[in-house]
Amino acid sequence: MHELTLCQRAIEIIEQQAQQHGAKKVTAVWLEIGAFSCVETSSLDFCFGMVCRRTLAEGCQLHLHQQEAECWCYDCQQSVTLLTIQVRRCPQCQGDNLRIVADDGIQLKRMEIEQEI
């Protein structure tokens, strides 16, 4: 279950950023998940709750957004978007000579904090 490892790394980054900004608590986190990242969102949600325990992010609200796959089609020389991992054909020319440009990871997009007074 690589979701646990991803969450552990995300919490490290979240804690680091929260401390740099003088946070006493992280209240919400927005993560973007790539369409081809092979991340199961329900597992990610469960693991995130576990790794947040006894951190500044404990009890925070997790918002997940599924990113579409951005690809380059070598057949028609177009930048295209794939909507699901099951469809690996260019929506423009139906070619299968695609290179994934962006979408295979997980990114911390935003976080809300309560600052110390």
Curated annotation (Swiss-Prot):
Homology family: Belongs to the HypA/HybF family.
Role played: Involved in the maturation of [NiFe] hydrogenases. Required for nickel insertion into the metal center of the hydrogenase.
Listed name of the protein: Hydrogenase maturation factor HypA
Cytoplasm keyword on record: no
Alphabetical keyword list: Metal-binding, Nickel, Zinc
Top-level taxon in the UniProt lineage: Bacteria
UniProt-listed PANTHER family: HYDROGENASE MATURATION FACTOR HYPA (PTHR34535:SF3)
Pfam families per record: HypA
GO biological process, one term: protein modification process
Organism classification: Bacteria, Pseudomonadati, Pseudomonadota, Gammaproteobacteria, Enterobacterales
Molecular functions per Gene Ontology: nickel cation binding; zinc ion binding
Source species of the chain: Pectobacterium atrosepticum (strain SCRI 1043 / ATCC BAA-672) (Erwinia carotovora subsp. atroseptica)
Cystine bridges: none
Binding site for Zn(2+): C73, C76, C90, C93
Presence of keyword Nucleotide-binding: no
Binding residue positions for Ni(2+): H2
